UniProtKB/Swiss-Prot annotation:
Its cofactor is a metal cation; thiamine diphosphate. Signal peptide: none annotated. This is Pyruvate decarboxylase 2. Homotetramer. GO terms for biological process: aromatic amino acid family catabolic process to alcohol via Ehrlich pathway. Binds 1 metal ion per subunit. Binds 1 thiamine pyrophosphate per subunit. It comes from Oryza sativa subsp. indica (Rice). Keywords: Decarboxylase, Lyase, Magnesium, Metal-binding, Thiamine pyrophosphate.
């Protein structure tokens, strides 16, 4: 049960540590050493200590935007073997990239400058907090001598109080540390990193700009491996929770299981599948849990998303007389405007450290992974719900065949995306109609899938794609991005080319913010059309490997995909798909109307 983070292999040396950005070859970093090499007394600086600790927990890429308060720190991060500095176009994308990297690797890091950089990355860190991702946000701070004086510094709002950035981060991180002296710097750094890993949340670490190059005896010692004390269940509480749940489920006629997004933070995906195997229950996932458990299991029935669930899934879940939700998040988006047809007295809610059984007892200090494992040993086999699903299930039809040179429909696009998926691929779905179209994709074993549902920040996918692809070198990542979202964060396609990534981006150009149109339409949802392939070609500028294509019909799409998977397989492939402005999934139409109704509820009587 003990977790020694120091046993996580460090990354091999980057080929070009001298420049901010990925090495020209961008070859993946094989993990080689369990512990960073000891440094000499002359190298025992604060900056190198931080770099070594990042490598030790599995970070081999730090997404950064340089600024005068963090330049010396960046020098020391670059000097660390095994640590790459990936220079991003802006701080928001650096934060999104750290988010995507944490999804692929388990932990991510970004480095920005004081206040102007920190407040720019804040939105991305809030998103990582909402998704329970350990991201270490490092900010270069003012000279330690300036704290406590009446000096007014640049990159501030003109006050001698330098705490504005810290106060902003207090609400979106689980731990904050401001390092202004060397005496306890090692302890502050280690505590921040350990807290991020333990809580699975972002942390904020500010380091005064005059400290990274300074040595201190605490930095020359061989660092103690991180030790995260495991969270253990209260044995009596665990036994009582299992007993109450077994009684609840065993008397049900057609119970079902539903996996939620907190399976990730609880590291309970395998325990959930083991429970499926032991119980024989039909199981579904909430939309934000897609990709966390296998979809190739015979008892998988799809995505449960209320009125916009995949075919026949909602009927089975909502007609069950008992449903166990493992790690759910019920918000207005996931509940389709609070329109779920679920009853509390039929539900068992299992959170990472808590179990609630129907209208009855709640059991605290019960770890989800341990609870599901114990439950699997005692629950009776019951395949009734799955057998009901098989009786009513009708295989999904195919989109209508396209006429020659017929304008491309979005459902035809996703028919072809489905054929591209395998165990060596991953899908990034941007906020918008891609949420709904990608939910219908059937993921092969080992195929990754990520999207940001709780926070739902448009533009997230561009930076997240950069970070995920950098962290998962063994996968070819396919991103589905709307034109409105792309306009928010497009610049870091540049960084993808610089890092020699070979992701495939489908840019769906339908002329506006389609998801907003279906919630509440207005002229503000119409955007200026760009020449998207021309933009990416300009960013490419003949440097690195990048290929673009603009497609308007199925024949052109088929040809473009063939090129992306064949001749251009080593290139970043950008395929602009021209779609009609009203070409949306039926799920978005239904979801949008229900969320709109929830948003427009009148005030309660006072």
């Amino acid at each position: 049960m003990e977790t020694h983070i120091g046993s996580v292999d460090g990354a091999a040396a980057a080929a070009d540590n001298g420049a901010v950005g990925c090495p020209a070859s961008a070859v993946g970093c094989p993990m080689t050493s369990a512990r960073p090499a000891p440094v000499s007394a002359g190298e025992a600086s604060l900056g190198r200590h931080l770099a070594r600790r990042l490598v030790q927990v599995g970070v081999s890429d730090v997404f950064a935007v340089p600024g005068d308060f963090n330049l010396t720190l960046l020098d020391h991060l670059i000097a660390e073997p095994g640590l790459r500095l990936v220079g991003c176009c802006n701080e928001l994308n650096a934060g999104y990239a750290a988010d995507g990297y944490a999804r692929a690797r388990g932990v991510g890091a970004c480095a920005v400058t004081f206040t102007v950089g920190g407040l720019s990355v804040l939105n991305a860190i809030a998103g990582a907090y909402s998704e329970n991702l350990p991201v270490i946000c490092i900010a270069g701070g003012p000279n330690s001598n300036d704290y406590g004086t009446n000096r007014i510094l640049h990159h501030t709002i003109g006050l001698p109080d330098f705490s504005q950035e810290l106060r902003c981060f207090q609400t979106v991180t689980c731990h904050q540390a401001v390092v202004t002296n060397l005496e306890d710097a090692h302890e502050q750094i280690d505590t921040a990193i350990a807290t991020a890993l333990r809580e699975s949340k972002p942390v904020y670490l500010s380091i005064s700009c005059n400290l990274p190059g300074l040595p201190h005896p605490t930095f020359s010692r061989d660092p103690v491996p991180f030790f995260l004390a495991p969270r253990l269940s209260n044995k009596m509480g665990l036994e009582a929770a299992v007993e109450a749940t077994v009684e609840f489920l065993n008397k049900a006629v057609k119970p079902v299981l539903v996996g939620g997004p907190k399976l990730r933070v609880a590291k309970a995906g395998k325990a959930f599948v083991d429970l499926v195997d032991a119980s024989g229950y039909a199981y579904a996932v909430m939309p934000s849990a897609k990709g966390l458990v296998p979809e190739t299991h015979p008892h998988f029935i799809g995505t449960y998303w209320g009125a916009v669930s995949t075919a026949f899934c909602a009927e089975i879940v909502e007609s069950a007389d008992a449903y166990l939700f493992a790690g759910p998040i019920f918000n207005d988006y996931s509940s389709v405007g609070y329109s779920f047809l679920l009853k509390k007295d039929k539900a068992i809610i299992v959170q990472p450290e808590r179990v609630i059984v129907g209208n009855g007892p709640a059991f605290g200090c019960v770890m989800m992974k341990e609870f599901l494992s114990e439950l699997a040993k005692r629950v009776n086999k019951n395949t009734t719900a799955y057998e009901n699903y098989k009786r009513i299930f009708v295989p999904e039809g195919q989109p209508l065949e396209s006429e020659p040179n017929e304008p491309l429909r979005v459902n035809v696009l996703f028919k072809h995306v489905q054929k591209m998926l395998n165990s060596d691929s991953a899908v990034i779905a941007e906020t918008g109609d891609s949420w709904f179209n990608c939910q219908k994709l059937k993921l092969p074993e080992g195929c990754g899938y990520e999207f940001q549902m709780q926070y739902g920040s448009i533009g997230w996918s561009v930076g997240a794609l950069l970070g995920y692809a950098q962290g998962a070198k063994d996968k070819r990542v396919i991103a589905c991005i709307g034109d409105g979202s792309f306009q928010v964060t497009a610049q870091d396609v540049s960084t993808m080319i610089r890092c020699a990534q070979n992701s495939i981006i489908f840019l769906i150009n339908n002329g506006g913010y389609t998801i907003e149109v279906e919630i509440h339409d207005g002229p503000y949802n119409v955007i200026k059309n760009w020449n998207y392939t021309g933009l990416v070609d300009a960013i490419h500028n003949g440097e690195g490997k990048c290929w673009t294509s603009k497609v308007k019909c199925e024949e052109e799409l088929t040809e473009a995909i063939g090129m992306a998977l064949g001749e251009k397989k080593d290139c970043l492939c950008f395929i602009e798909v021209i779609a009609h402005k009203d070409d949306t999934s039926k799920e978005l139409l239904e979801w949008g109307s229900r969320v709109s109704a929830a948003n427009s509820r009148p005030p309660n009587p006072q």
